Swiss-Prot record:
GO biological process, one term: lipid A biosynthetic process
Protein name, as recorded: Lipid A 1-phosphatase
Molecular function GO labels: hydrolase activity
Provenance organism: Rhizobium etli (strain ATCC 51251 / DSM 11541 / JCM 21823 / NBRC 15573 / CFN 42)
Keyword Membrane: yes
Length: 232
């Protein structure tokens, strides 16, 4: 991994989580969210559910596999195979980052914002077996971060839009009162890191990505039309 990039990203992540804990978590835990904000969060948060994201990855995988068998030209087969590997990559990042995040949140055992007045924002009960003590990091935000970071790496031209989607869907967990802001930031960052590391592994296996001279994973260009300005 490129030394300067990962160190800078890690520094930013740690400070963002720490500042959020110090500045934003207590006000969020102590205050009641406006009804309109909570309703908006409830409306949007389902779009980041891991079940949907896993279904998308599986659909892409099998669509690519079917295309590989049905299409005739070598170029079409290569593109279909590329789609199937995108599905496999998304599945890997979403499923395994989510599993790790769930293990972490159980091991850390941070109380959720609903219990702020009872326990405060720095109450930790590891391996309690109760969802009330599984706040940090946000598993929902982890899968969202992994999913959209994967797309940002695959299609970097649109990375700003993907990052914005991840932030919005992640912060819906704050809107509905399920997590503190620091839980969401940590989850998004963890998911993004997992996608990056997985992309590096794929690149070393010659799949989907190639490594730049500085070690950063770059998506292979098998869809030149997507790279044209204005293309979707």
């Amino acid at each position: 991994m490129p030394p300067l990039r990962w160190q800078a990203c890690l520094f930013i992540t740690i400070n963002a989580v720490a500042l959020s804990m110090l500045l934003f978590d207590a006000p969020v835990g102590a205050s009641e969210r406006p009804a309109a904000v909570k309703e908006l969060g409830e409306l949007l948060t389902g779009f980041g559910d891991s079940a949907w994201l896993i279904c998308i990855s599986i659909l892409l995988f099998f669509q690519g596999k079917a295309g590989y068998k049905l299409l005739k030209t070598a170029r079409s087969k290569a593109q279909a195979l590329y789609v199937s590997w995108i599905g496999a990559y998304l599945f890997t990042t979403v499923v395994f980052s989510g599993l790790l995040a769930n293990l972490l949140k159980r091991a850390i055992g941070r109380a959720r914002p609903d219990h702020f007045h009872d326990y405060g924002m720095f109450s930790f009960t590891p391996f309690s077996g109760h969802a009330a003590f599984e706040s940090f990091p946000s598993g929902h935000s982890t899968t969202v971060g992994a999913f959209f970071a994967a797309f940002a790496l695959l299609f970097p031209r649109y990375r700003v839009a993907f990052i914005a989607c991840a932030i919005w869907l992640g912060m819906t967990r704050v809107m509905v009162g399920a997590h503190y802001p620091s839980d969401v930031i940590a989850g998004l960052a963890f998911g993004g890191w997992f996608s990056l590391l997985t992309a590096i592994v794929y690149a070393r296996c010659g799949l989907l990505f190639k490594l730049a001279p500085d070690g950063w994973p770059l998506a292979k260009r098998l869809f030149p039309d997507i790279e044209k300005p204005g293309a979707l």
